[in-house]
Amino acid sequence: MSVHREIPLDFDGVLADEGNGSVVRRSVLPGGVRVLTEAMPDQRSVTIGYWVAVGSRDESPEGYGATHFLEHLLFKGTPTRTAMDIAAAFDRVGGESNAGTAKESTVYHARVLDEDLPMAVEVLTDMLTSSLIDPDELETERGVILEELAMDADDPVDVAHEKLAEVMLDGHPLGRPIGGTPETIRAVTRDHVVGHLSLIHI
């Protein structure tokens, strides 16, 4: 399956012109998805990112940490790709992929050579639209996330940021830790993660 095709863009304008041949443009796909592009004529590599306006603030009280789980689990397989297939697609071409969770957004991104952009678009789109959210992988990632939280708890800067948000925004979803807490991560179920995935509209 290939998603590489010409898609008509409704051109919306130039956002920034750096004067060095690098111009940021904003376009809109027919379904309403906003596309920002920046051409860098001297570069052969391409970075693509899907910024989703769903973050930890959107979690239900009983599903704190679901965004962080989702960030991990989207890389773990679709009906047409295993986790190994997803990783190998980028490794094979010397590319890389990753994701990051924030309070109000999540980003899934990849960097490849320009000739491999269609592959990167296809794989990232498959991950975002067809993830299996495998129960066994969820349990594996639960351990990984608990280790990440333990490492964060050993970093004074991370602890200070989390405590400041907690005190300043007491009771508000923005005051909660982005990654959840050990207690909430232990309690997150597959249903919480699938419910959170349903908030993402591609």
Predicted feature locations:
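M16/MPP (pitrilysin/insulinase) zinc-metallopeptidase core fold and M16-derived inactive scaffolds
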Residues: 42, 47-114
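Charge-rich, well-structured scaffold segments of protease-associated domains
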Residues: 1-9, 22-23, 28, 39, ...
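Short loop/turn motifs at secondary-structure junctions and domain boundaries
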Residues: 16-19
